[in-house]
From Swiss-Prot:
Its main location: endoplasmic reticulum. CDD domains: p23_CS_SGT1_like, p23_like, Peptidase_C19R. The modification Phosphoserine is found at S220. Its EC number is 3.4.19.12. This is Ubiquitin carboxyl-terminal hydrolase 19. Zn(2+) 1 binds at C833, C836, C859, C863. Zn(2+) 2 binds at C850, C853, H871, C875. Induction: Up-regulated by ESR1 in the presence of 17 beta-estradiol (E2). The active site is at C548, H1207. Residues 1-46, 163-239, 432-482, 965-988, 1259-1281 are annotated as: Disordered. Residues 1-1333 are cytoplasmic.
Length: 1360
């Protein structure tokens, strides 16, 4: 050939040669592209710029990197995109053959990566950083810096493997090129970089270790290489060692597992390389014996058919231990852990999960090509084994698993209810059976979010601490794992701790509200994952100005599981009734759905519900503006509005109320419910509405009317405010010490029968044999009949209850007598005249006492007559001790028996002491008889001021001795003289008594000594019947005239029921054997059952409220019922009973009472309600079901403050979809824009107002997702218009949602409590603020008027 020909020949060449060469290239290219899992790339010049063309943009945040690829102009189907990720690199293959990939600048969390489709033919990759807060200067590493981590070698059972020889005949020219390129010479190079031809087509997979049994004692023998030849093992060669290190030490993601066995196990190490065909370090398979002939033939056959030479021979009995499988896990409540293992196309017939107390093992086979490509040499018949050593013990018998199309779901039941904080046990503990486990250096699966949630990585400081804790664990492993566990960059350079980093937020145990799965028809998934600022369910609501009532209701309803799931995926649009005049045309339903999404996306710290408020205000003008309203009222209107928007009834028929007319209740109730559903049929009705039975009874004709009505919530009344009254109970016999009881009664509308009934149960005495009396100033103020009101009785008043003898028991008439005690001489000292105020000058001018009361003194009768008009109302004897009632049969009413009873009762309330006898005192027989008339006259004239007026001339004056001689200096005897009663509280003035000159008692009158001795008096047995009595007994008749009783021996006394008795103690010091007497605190025993009555006085239970709700009541006159039989309005008796209970039960505690426009009140008493297992079986008389109607609490609305101003908050949890006893998100406190976690024990407070209960084991079936035309076939062409209308409303509300700014802060503009104040308005409405302050000032003035005028009148009326 000529030179020119030789020069141009290679370019042009003969036509036949060029055509043959082109056809050969096309055939080779088609063969390579048709093979599944081929790791080789075809070096084509046109694919070199693919990477630059695909990469559109990338950006990073503190914890993730987002890469956007330009795929094309049309929609992208994620099913056709093949993406594989490791912690260091990735590769993305498109359906048209294009691909993108590379080695990242730093490590990522490959298990948390996401591939998302976007509008405009974009593909978005979300790559969570393994090291948060680490700034990446570039997305990919430069080509010259992608080096391996030196020093890692492959080992087996603690010994290094022999070096692997390079095959001499494997394209030496290519090997030289790879040797010059450090990046391509490593065992695992850049993936999909697209930097030049021949780049690897798939990602560098994690190292898999395959195990095969071999005879003990046999060494490793040659096996088939990539070309079908057995590689030889070289020894002590630098080149071989370097090749071994490059093969056995891939960076970061090499993971190896060893399976323990009784026989020796041979190690098979398989790794996908950069270029399987041309790489000099081709993967080999180490075996313990020569391959079988059948296997060798199979390998040759696969190579002849163009199979991948790097793939292992498929063996049905091979077992591959996996150190890591893509998974995540989360704790489902305190008792379970859910693990999701993401492997597709599982062969269910040969896959299973084995559970033990400390671990579980997943054994499976898969046909997923992407998974098999990550494990070279594995095929559909390969058995994979993944064993996880658990952090704590489990119950193997209660653990379950199930297979889905894309994953395996494993549910682990904890042995103890506690928080694990992670799934796997620390690496130093090893796996069960003695095998070592290579634990990933990244965060544990529980550190990631549950499925569907965004990543919540640790802060840099916490990540550094986590690495420091795991470093000694990795080093403590034996040498068998040194070549498996790769070091992370954190072990070289720990991130600098940031002192300003906030503490991590609580872990969310529930996935956020999921969106519809992305498909080829739907690529409009929101880009909200990158905007998350809080955990799902922790978004607050901004207070727009006294709108805390609305915020608390919305937060409670958003945690209603069925309602939340119903609105999350737009399937409710099929049920929107756009033509309902009572609704909003779907705007309220769609606005509520938009708000629910905002609360569960986690993209707002606080969201403004202004659009929903505007929609509600457009239908209910009372909610216009920013004034306070009742939360229950707003909740009822909101649910009713949602019901009307979702009402399935297009044309409501006319229905009438169904009455019983003697038919069975079951028939009438079902008929009434069906009639209600003819007009009201929606998801709100299915979820919230129940049915109760209303029974009306006419008081005149006894006509009974029974109807069945629906209810949305139960307004249960609270028991009225209670007061605790101390009651002193006296038994029928005086030898029993009085007992003090504490009885709770209502502050309003209480009667004496409540106290008598309560005491009757305590002392086991019939109520008709008890008498209740009030004591004021040591005398009976009044004796209550059972019907008498106790509203005017305060807890400080003294109430005595006496047991009386029953006439049925005595078989004769029983005499009941009131007895009061008083001294013969009052203990009040007299130092001056009551009329002229002149003090006593000398002994000759002694002041004379009034003989009626002995409490005042006068100079003469002139002063007495002058002072009588003023003294008349106060002239009464001085009483001491407590009065009491005695009941004696008429036949046994003797003086001795009466004296015995009186002395027995009196000793509990007075202290009596009789000093030793002194001979110098006057005897009774030596007294002048003239003084008897004086005393008799005085006694007859003694009485209350209510009797007939007495002229002053009829009164007698007695002359006491000088006050200096009254014995005021007398003291009690020493304590060693005998059992002297306590003198505490007894002053010297009380001991002083002025003796009366010449005024003795009746001569010769003696009273037999009662059987019971008076405390403080020491006497011998022979002198018991010889001493004088210590008191006298006087009879007081109906006209208040007193007469001293005489001892008639065994003859019964003649006393009527209209008289009373007075016990007069002989305390005149001038008389023989006088006594010292004074009042004392009543001696009594405390009732042990009343110890907690005071604490329970202000506490009620929900059962008590439900009992009041179901108790019959009489209708008020303005609510009178029209009796169809009497043809008149009657104040009938009405009773409500529960018949049908809903799935979600709302209970309103009626804390607010409105008596009038001015008089309003709120009850702040504690109502104890169960958080778990509210049993309503005793209140529900209707549905007889096998399962009891048990409910669990999931939300509470609280109200703080009073009627004028207050604040609403809410506590809620998100119950599990299948069990209301478990929570997917725990209890949180919603205080407007602030959301914090709370303990379940803090939910029950005295401020609870509205309770939300969810029924156990009674889920509500959601309606099937159908098109609007399918649900309403009668609409015809209007279905498309309705659907487009819903779409327009969605776009409008979502656009307004984006324009609404976020809340100003966690506390909102009004602080933690939004007491009434001016709302945040603009300057265009200044008059509204003035009007608001004017209204507030008026209300404050009315309150002050009530407190200053009406309250004193009410407080004084009780004393009248």
């Amino acid at each position: 050939m000529s030179a020119g020909a030789s020069a141009t020949g290679p370019r042009r060449g003969p036509p036949g040669l060029e055509e043959a060469t082109s056809k050969k290239k096309q055939k080779d290219r088609a063969n390579l592209e048709s093979k599944d899992g081929d790791a080789r790339r075809v070096s084509l010049p046109r694919k070199e710029p693919t990477k630059d063309e695909l990469l559109l943009d990338w950006r990073q945040s503190a914890d993730e990197v987002i890469v956007k690829l330009r795929v094309g102009t049309g929609p992208v189907r994620l099913e056709d995109v093949d993406a594989a990720f490791t912690d260091t690199d990735c590769v993305v293959r498109l359906p048209d053959g294009r691909q993108w990939g590379g080695v990242f600048f730093a490590e990522i969390q490959s298990s948390c990566t996401k591939v998302q489709a976007r509008k405009g033919g974009l593909l978005q990759l979300v790559l969570p950083k393994k090291v948060p807060l680490l700034t990446w200067p570039s997305l990919l590493k430069p080509l010259g810096t992608q080096e391996l981590v030196p020093g890692l070698q492959c080992q087996e059972n603690g010994q290094e493997l022999s070096p692997i020889a390079l095959e001499p005949g494997s394209e030496p020219r290519r090997a030289k090129q790879e040797a010059r390129n450090q990046k391509r010479a490593q065992g695992r190079g850049e993936v999909g970089s697209g930097a030049g031809p021949g780049t690897q087509a798939g990602p560098s997979a994690k190292r898999a270790v395959h195990l095969r049994r071999g005879p003990e004692g046999e060494g490793s023998m040659d096996g088939p290489g990539p070309q079908g030849d057995a590689p030889s093992f070289l020894s002590d060669s630098a080149t071989q060692v370097e090749a071994e290190e490059k093969l056995c030490a891939p960076p970061m993601n090499t993971q190896t597992s060893l399976l323990s066995s009784e026989k020796s196990l041979a190690l098979l190490t398989v790794e996908k390389t950069v270029s399987p065909r041309n790489d000099p370090v081709a993967p080999v398979m180490v075996q313990d014996r020569d391959p079988e002939p059948e296997q060798e033939d199979q390998v040759k056959e696969e190579m002849a058919l163009g199979a991948d030479p790097t793939a292992l021979v498929e063996e049905p009995e091979s077992m591959v231990n996996l150190a890591f499988v893509k998974n995540d896990s989360y704790e489902k409540g305190p008792d379970s852990v859910v693990v999701h293992v993401y492997v597709k196309e599982i062969r269910r017939d040969s896959s299973r999960v084995l559970f033990r107390e400390q671990d579980f093992t997943l054994i499976f086979q898969t046909r997923d090509g992407n998974f098999l490509r990550l494990h070279p040499g594995c095929g559909p018949h390969t058995i994979f084994r993944w064993q996880v050593k658990l952090r704590n013990l489990i119950e193997p018998e209660q653990c379950t698993f199930c297979f889905t199309a894309s994953r395996i779901d494993i549910c682990l039941r904890k042995r103890q209810s506690q928080r694990w904080g992670g799934l796997e046990a620390p690496a130093t503990r090893g796996a069960v059976g003695g095998a070592k486990v290579a634990v990933p250096t990244g965060p544990t699966p529980l550190d990631s979010t549950p499925p569907g949630g965004g990543p919540h990585p640790l802060t840099g400081q916490e990540e550094a601490r986590a690495v420091e804790k795991e470093k000694p664990k990795a080093r403590s492993e034996d040498s068998g794992l040194d070549g498996v566990v790769a070091r992370t960059p954190l072990e070289h350079v720990a991130p600098k701790p940031d002192p300003h980093l906030a503490s991590p937020k609580p872990t969310c145990m529930v996935p956020p509200m999921p969106h519809s799965p992305v498909s080829g028809d739907s690529v409009e998934e929101d880009e909200e994952e990158e905007k998350k600022v809080c955990l799902p369910g922790f978004t607050g609501l901004v207070n727009l100005g006294n709108t805390c009532f609305m915020n608390s209701v919305i937060q409670s309803l958003s945690n209603t599981r069925e309602l939340r799931d119903f609105f999350h995926d737009r399937s409710f649009e099929a049920e929107i009734n756009y033509n309902n005049p009572l609704g909003t045309g779907g705007r309220l339903a769609i606005g509520f759905a938009v708000l629910l999404r905002a609360l569960w996306k986690g993209t707002h710290q606080a969201f403004q519900p202004s659009k929903l408020k505007a929609i509600v205000a457009s239908k209910a003008s009372q909610f216009t503006g920013y004034a306070q309203h009742d939360a229950q009222e707003f909740m009822a209107f909101l649910l009713d509005g949602l019901h009307e928007d979702l009402n399935r009834i297009q044309n409501k028929p006319y229905t009438e109320t169904v009455d019983s007319d003697g038919r069975p209740d079951e028939v009438v109730a079902e008929e009434a419910w069906q009639r209600h559903k003819m007009r009201n049929d929606s998801f709100i009705v299915d979820l919230f509405q129940g049915q109760y039975k209303s029974k009306l009874v006419c008081p005149v004709c006894a006509k009974v009317s029974i109807t069945f009505d629906p209810f949305l919530y139960l307004p249960v009344p609270l028991p009225q405010k209670q007061k605790v009254l101390p009651i002193f109970y006296f038994a029928r016999e005086p030898h029993s010490k009085p007992i003090k009881f504490l009885v709770s009664v209502s502050k309003e509308n209480s009667s004496a029968s409540e106290v008598l009934d309560s005491l009757s149960q305590s002392v086991h005495v019939k109520p008709e044999n008890l008498r209740l009396a009030e004591v004021i100033k040591n005398r009976f103020h009044r004796v209550f009949l059972p019907s008498h009101s106790l509203d005017a009785v305060s807890p400080t008043d003294v109430l005595l209850c006496f047991e009386l003898l029953s006439p049925e028991l005595a078989k004769e008439r029983v005499v009941v007598l009131e007895v009061q005690q008083r001294p013969q001489v009052p203990s009040i000292p007299i130092s001056k005249c009551a009329a002229c105020q002149r003090k006593q000058q000398s002994e000759e001018e002694k002041l004379k006492r009034c003989t009626r009361c002995y409490r005042v003194g006068y100079c003469n009768q002139f002063c007495q007559k002058t002072h009588w008009p003023d003294h008349k109302g106060l002239c009464r004897p001085e009483n001491i001790g407590y009065p009491f009632l005695v009941s004696v049969p008429a036949s046994r009413l003797t003086y001795a028996r009466l004296a015995q009873l009186l002395e027995g009762y009196a000793r509990y309330s007075v202290s009596v002491f009789q000093p030793p006898f002194q001979p110098g005192r006057m005897a009774l027989e030596s007294q002048s008889p003239g003084c008897t008339t004086l005393l008799s006259t005085s006694s007859l004239e003694a009485g209350d001021s209510e009797r007939e007026p007495i002229q002053p001339s009829e009164l007698q004056l007695v002359t006491p001795v000088a006050e200096g001689d009254t014995g005021a200096h007398r003291v009690w005897p020493p304590a060693d003289r005998g059992p002297v009663p306590s003198t505490s509280g007894l002053s010297s003035e009380m001991l002083a008594s002025g003796p009366i000159e010449g005024c003795p008692l009746l001569a010769g009158e003696r009273v037999s000594r009662p059987e019971a001795a008076v405390p403080g008096y020491q006497h011998s047995s022979e002198s018991v019947n010889t001493h004088t009595p210590q008191f006298f007994i006087y009879k007081i008749d109906a006209s208040n005239r007193e007469q001293r009783l005489e001892d008639k021996g065994e003859t019964p006394l003649e006393l009527g029921d209209d008289c009373s008795l007075a016990l007069v103690w002989r305390n005149n010091e001038r008389l023989q054997e006088f006594v010292l007497v004074a009042s004392k605190e009543l001696e009594c025993a405390e009732d042990p059952g009343s110890a907690g009555e005071a604490a329970r006085a202000g506490h009620f239970t929900l059962d008590q409220c439900l009992n009041l709700f179901t108790r019959p009541e009489v209708l008020a006159p303005e609510e009178a019922w029209y009796c169809p039989q009497c043809k008149q309005h009657r104040e009938a008796s009405k009773q409500l009973l529960l018949w049908r209970l809903p799935n979600v039960l709302i209970v309103q505690l009626k804390r607010f009472s409105f008596r009038s426009f001015i008089w309003r009140d709120k009850i702040n008493d504690l109502v104890e309600f169960p958080v778990r297992n509210l049993d309503l079986s005793k209140f529900c008389i209707g549905q007889k079901e096998e399962q009891l109607p048990s409910y669990d609490l999931y939300a509470v609305i609280n109200h703080y403050g009073g009627m004028i101003g207050g604040h609403y908050t809410a506590c809620a949890r998100l119950p599990n979809d299948r069990s209301s006893q478990r929570s997917d998100v725990g209890w949180r406190l919603f205080d407007d824009s602030t959301v914090t976690t709370v303990d379940e024990s803090q939910v029950v407070t005295r401020y609870a107002y509205v309770l939300f209960y969810r029924r156990r084991n009674s889920p509500v079936e959601r309606p099937p997702r159908a098109s609007h035309s399918e649900h309403h076939p009668d609409l015809g062409p209007a279905a498309e218009a309705a659907a487009s209308q819903a779409s327009r409303i969605w776009q409008e509300l979502e656009a307004e949602e984006e324009m609404v700014p976020e809340g100003p802060g966690p506390l909102g503009p009004w602080g933690p409590q939004d007491w009434v104040g001016p709302p945040p308005r603009g300057p265009t409405t200044p008059d509204e603020g003035c009007l608001r302050y004017f209204v507030l000032g008026t209300v404050a003035a009315l309150v002050a008027l009530v407190l200053n005028v009406f309250y004193p009148l009410v407080s004084q009326s009780r004393w009248r």
